[in-house]
Amino acid sequence: MSEAKRLAAEKAIEYVEDGMIVGVGTGSTVAYFIDALARIQHRIKGAVSSSEQSTARLKQHGIEVIELNHSGNLSLYVDGADECDANKCLIKGGGAALTREKIIAEASERFICIIDPSKQVPVLGRFPLPVEVIPMARSLVARQIRDMTGGQPTWREGVVTDNGNQILDIHNLQITDPEKLERELNQLPGVVCVGLFARRRADVVIVGGEPPVVL
């Protein structure tokens, strides 16, 4: 699948225009995009990064990393996904960067999602849904999510997000109405961010292959 990821990332470079500040996500597919972006870094002003991991890779290539507070709205955000349905709704957060990813997606005019074919699903939920929570609320939120959804929350023990929070992964979901579930989970006290990208879903999905498929 690494070749499919690389091909999707290379295709996404076609959406980068001169003078842009590019929003950059997190994960193994995005790493290929950062490497490809390095080849045209003379054409862009810099990048807004969604994680310390991506920031390190961008700086390794000499790409200037700009704070979102200083960049204003972005024309383009490129990120991967853990799952993608036919409506371009996503599950994200396997890399625990979901909150910053959602912030940058919200600030961007166009959200390009790059995936390999294994990430395409008819119904979201086979991949456990990540939820970032305030540490003191972890057990409370887990109980409330279990009662609300029937899913099985597990604590991603040992993982601390870049924001200092913890992650619950919700197993055994079949998410037939992603927007509704995203809205309901966001209302629980202690929830920082839900790894459903349905209200702000991808505008374009690129599925890696020979040739890549643009949805």
Swiss-Prot record:
One GO cellular component term: cytosol
Active site (record annotation): 101 (proton acceptor)
UniProt-listed InterPro entries: NagB/RpiA_transferase-like, Ribose5P_isomerase_typA_subgr, Ribose5P_isomerase_type_A
UniProt key word Isomerase: yes
GO terms (BP aspect): D-ribose metabolic process; pentose-phosphate shunt, non-oxidative branch
GO molecular function: ribose-5-phosphate isomerase activity
Chain residues that bind substrate: 26-29, 79-82, 92-95, 119
Statement: the UniProt record of this protein carries the keyword Isomerase: yes
Keywords, sorted A to Z: Isomerase
Catalytic reaction(s) noted: aldehydo-D-ribose 5-phosphate = D-ribulose 5-phosphate
Domain of life of the native organism: Bacteria
Pathway(s): Carbohydrate degradation; pentose phosphate pathway; D-ribose 5-phosphate from D-ribulose 5-phosphate (non-oxidative stage): step 1/1
Enzyme Commission identifier(s): 5.3.1.6
HAMAP family: Rib_5P_isom_A
Assembly description: Homodimer.
PANTHER family given in the database record: RIBOSE-5-PHOSPHATE ISOMERASE
NCBIfam families associated with the record: PRK00702.1, rpiA
Homology family: Belongs to the ribose 5-phosphate isomerase family.
Physiological role: Catalyzes the reversible conversion of ribose-5-phosphate to ribulose 5-phosphate.
Protein's name according to its UniProt entry: Ribose-5-phosphate isomerase A
Organism in which the protein naturally occurs: Stenotrophomonas maltophilia (strain K279a)
Biological classification of the source: Bacteria, Pseudomonadati, Pseudomonadota, Gammaproteobacteria, Lysobacterales
Gene name for this UniProt entry: rpiA
